[in-house]
Amino acid sequence: YYASRGLGDVYKRQSYAYISTGNFNEKTATLYADCGLFTCRKEIVNDLYNLFRTLQGKEDPKFTTLLVARFNLIPELNRLIDREISLADQGKGGRIILKMNALQDPAMIDRLYEASEHGVQIDLIVRGICCLIPEQSYSRNIRVTRIVDSFLEHARIWYFGNEGHPKIYMGSPDWMRRNLYRRIEAVTPILDPDPVSYTH
């Protein structure tokens, strides 16, 4: 969600962005556990504004911070995985933790297998369907966990170790073909230290 309000001076406005792993649904709000980020960081707010302009056909898709499905999400995910593979190859301990509702996309599953074969330590927290096969020779460094709790785990949070300087993302897409290639869904990095420590 994007909002903008005046600051008393007709020429001054403050814009805000809210990016969540779920939506505002009164029926599921009492059952689902989600995360949301409410921010006025310009790089995130500007990207979200550009996304809405793109959906209206008024802007070319240019995103510097957000990862947006059908635009820059897949290339950036591949870059993040490649980084962890490179670190593992150098003996610096590649690390990936992914929390999501479903893992089904064959291309991304193959990337996780590849990372595992290079020694990247991977933890998957998948609530629903998981097409990745753990405990095989090609997935020996991958652990799959499911959380059973009072509320339905709905958050999508991705952690990439980045040699001790973690890159953490949250957003709406699961790793399914419909989410990664057909829908337009947004993922934001967690840039401030307090939310980083909370999600970590």
Language model: regions and residue ranges:
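Single conserved hydrophobic/aromatic residue that forms the stacking wall/gate
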Residues: 1-11, 200
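Short, glycine-/Ser/Thr-/acidic-enriched flexible segments
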Residues: 9, 16, 22-26, 37, ...
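Structured core elements
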Residues: 9, 16-20, 66-68, 80, ...
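Polar, glycine-rich mid-to-C-terminal structural blocks
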Residues: 13-20, 27-30, 43-47, 54, ...
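Short acidic (Asp/Glu) and glycine-rich catalytic loops that position anionic groups and cofactors
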Residues: 25-33, 55-64, 89-93, 137-138, ...
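Long, C-terminal catalytic modules of enzymes
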Residues: 42-43, 50-83, 166-198
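Primarily the HKD phosphodiesterase
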Residues: 80-143
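Short beta-strand or tight-loop elements
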Residues: 140, 151-155
